[in-house]
């Protein structure tokens, strides 16, 4: 991690989160559940062997969770008569809930009532990235789980795949994140897949023009049109977010953007928005995987520390799908 980015991350944590964040600690479970990391790694490793998308699913849940009322596990709640974040359009197609349940069961068998669901998302995200050949970082613990969900917040705060860069930037700055964070965290699209419905508007009728998105590479466009034919029954059809190394966590996502082969509109906007400062960041990451990894780690630490519930706030759910 570069020195300036490290200092920036520390100052951000102190300024934004203050006393509540000070209660997060890498040693939080050292006495109450000392094997938490090995237990979570065991489940993630098993699931990753049968589902290459496991890590991508978990990190999406973590990101979407933290962007709505902070990192509090609210995205995991099932309905209890009110609408949940799971029901929000931004979370359509979200997966990995069963993986979280498996991790929670494994932890409850060893350390009942100790490890929060919010902390599970943070730790499993790091492990998922490492298992996909990405960087490692020290995860801080001590988050509590929320008692409620916020569907309206999910609708307003989570970037949709159809956003322009002008819309995305304030969504990030409102969470204390800058342009580097936006581009670095978007790099998580170096693994995982997306449904046709999240990008097919770019293939045939972009913004109601009757034509494809002109920023899509012509050969890539033909490939995608074959995967998601116009008027086809594409609801359950997925394709890779990274066409070159779809299961590896690397910097190919950024070289794809340079070739106009970003899958989602929000991806390609980072490179194709004329005059944007994000272009230089994309070029930097395309040229240096080390730089991408360093900044990604810094941004993930910032993400994981957005408005956590700590101390006497919240609870430790024994079942991540429902409050105790």
Swiss-Prot record:
Site description Transition state stabilizer, residues in chain: 60
Keyword field: Calcium, Disulfide bond, Glycoprotein, Heme, Hydrogen peroxide, Iron, Metal-binding, Oxidoreductase, Peroxidase, Pyrrolidone carboxylic acid, Secreted, Signal
CDD domains found in the cross-reference section: secretory_peroxidase
GO MF annotation terms: heme binding; lactoperoxidase activity; metal ion binding
Active site: 64
Residues bearing glycans: 35, 150, 207
Leader peptide range in chain numbering: 1-22
Cofactors demanded by this protein: Ca(2+); heme b
Highest classification ranks of the organism: Eukaryota, Viridiplantae, Streptophyta, Embryophyta, Tracheophyta
Name of the protein in its database record: Lignin-forming anionic peroxidase
Function field: Removal of H(2)O(2), oxidation of toxic reductants, biosynthesis and degradation of lignin, suberization, auxin catabolism, response to environmental stresses such as wounding, pathogen attack and oxidative stress. These functions might be dependent on each isozyme/isoform in each plant tissue.
PROSITE patterns with a match to the protein in the record: PEROXIDASE_1, PEROXIDASE_2, PEROXIDASE_4
Enzyme Commission number(s) from the entry: 1.11.1.7
Alphabetical list of InterPro entries matching this protein: Haem_peroxidase, Haem_peroxidase_sf, Peroxidase_pln, Peroxidases_AS, Peroxidases_heam-ligand_BS, Secretory_peroxidase
């Amino acid at each position: 991690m570069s020195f300036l980015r490290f200092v920036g991350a520390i100052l951000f944590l102190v300024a934004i989160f203050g006393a509540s964040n000070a209660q997060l600690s890498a040693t939080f479970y050292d006495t109450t559940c000392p094997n938490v990391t090995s237990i979570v790694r065991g489940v993630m490793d098993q699931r990753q062997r049968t589902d290459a998308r496991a890590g991508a699913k978990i990190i999406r849940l973590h990101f979407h969770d933290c962007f709505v009322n902070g990192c509090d596990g609210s995205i995991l709640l099932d309905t209890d008569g009110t609408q949940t974040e799971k029901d929000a359009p931004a979370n359509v197609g979200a997966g990995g809930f069963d993986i979280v349940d498996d991790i929670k069961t494994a932890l409850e068998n060893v350390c009942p009532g100790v490890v929060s669901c919010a902390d599970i998302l943070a730790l499993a995200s790091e492990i998922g990235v490492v298992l996909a050949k990405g960087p490692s970082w020290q995860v801080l613990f001590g988050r509590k789980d929320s008692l409620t969900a916020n569907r309206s917040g999910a609708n307003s705060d989570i970037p949709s795949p159809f956003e322009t860069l002008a819309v995305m930037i304030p969504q990030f700055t409102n969470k204390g994140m800058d342009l580097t964070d936006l581009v670095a965290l978007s790099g998580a699209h170096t693994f995982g897949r997306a449904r046709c419905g999240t990008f097919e508007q770019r293939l045939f009728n972009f913004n109601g023009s009757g034509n494809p998105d002109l920023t899509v590479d012509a050969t890539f466009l033909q490939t995608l049109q074959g995967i998601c034919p116009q008027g086809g029954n594409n609801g359950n059809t997925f394709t890779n977010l990274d066409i070159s190394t779809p299961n590896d966590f690397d910097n190919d996502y950024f070289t794809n953007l340079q070739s106009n082969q970003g899958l989602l509109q929000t991806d390609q906007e980072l490179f194709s928005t004329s005059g944007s400062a994000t272009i230089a960041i994309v070029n930097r990451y395309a040229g240096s995987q080390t730089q991408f990894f360093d900044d990604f780690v810094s941004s993930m630490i910032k993400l994981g520390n957005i408005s956590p519930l700590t101390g006497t706030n919240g609870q430790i759910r024994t079942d991540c799908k429902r409050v105790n």
